Amino acid sequence: MSDEEARQSGGSSQAGVVTVSDVQELMRRKEEIEAQIKANYDVLESQKGIGMNEPLVDCEGYPRSDVDLYQVRTARHNIICLQNDHKAVMKQVEEALHQLHARDKEKQARDMAEAHKEAMSRKLGQSESQGPPRAFAKVNSISPGSPASIAGLQVDDEIVEFGSVNTQNFQSLHNIGSVVQHSEGKPLNVTVIRRGEKHQLRLVPTRWAGKGLLGCNIIPLQR
């Protein structure tokens, strides 16, 4: 392989997707470099513990005769080069871990979105299979300008929910009357079926110029 091919190969590898095995290989390389650095420090230690900065000449300016100058210079040079390599590898490890963590977060977000979508699909499927909720009452008249008219109620709207009253707990119109009396000035959620479509309304029982707090007439539907 030529130098150019080697550079291209290396570039394409770096541009690829980072894997756990890539990080493991970088960690192995890091440990290998650290072992080499220690080995070279051991060489310096064996030479009178000379270290990285002690002079290699005596007080008269002559090369020291009590140490192997070649070994010391070589070990010092190796340590400097290896420390640079170690710094570069640590940067690669940091970048690789960052990519892995970012990918994990993206995967978690995708999984959560997919789970939410699936749950919503199941819920929608259940709703469709159950069909529209059954109405328990019907609006048969509305006075203009009344709270019911302002809320958007229309004649022939079939009520499936009126505040806390619904198909499951409705017994008589007294249930609706009780909710209205206890909700004067407070918004009530009212759900109706109008021409086959469900509509959500907010009705506020209020004293007005006409009779009652709603200004509409509601009749029960036969079950």
From Swiss-Prot:
Residues 108-195 form the PDZ domain. GO terms for cellular component: cytoplasm; cytosol; nucleus; proteasome regulatory particle. It comes from the Eukaryota. Residues 103-141 are annotated as: Disordered. Expressed in all tissues tested, highly expressed in liver and kidney. Keywords: Chaperone, Phosphoprotein. SUPFAM superfamilies: PDZ domain-like. Signal peptide: none annotated. Gene3D superfamilies: 2.30.42.10, 6.10.140.1710. Pfam families: Nas2_N (PF18265), PDZ_6 (PF17820). The modification Phosphoserine is found at S129. Residues 103-121 have a biased composition (Basic and acidic residues). One of its GO terms (molecular function) is bHLH transcription factor binding. The keyword Ribonucleoprotein does not apply. Interacts with PSMC3. Part of a transient complex (modulator) containing PSMD9, PSMC6 and PSMC3 formed during the assembly of the 26S proteasome. Belongs to the proteasome subunit p27 family. Acts as a chaperone during the assembly of the 26S proteasome, specifically of the base subcomplex of the PA700/19S regulatory complex (RC). During the base subcomplex assembly is part of an intermediate PSMD9:PSMC6:PSMC3 module, also known as modulator trimer complex; PSMD9 is released during the further base assembly process. This is 26S proteasome non-ATPase regulatory subunit 9. It comes from Homo sapiens (Human). The gene is PSMD9.
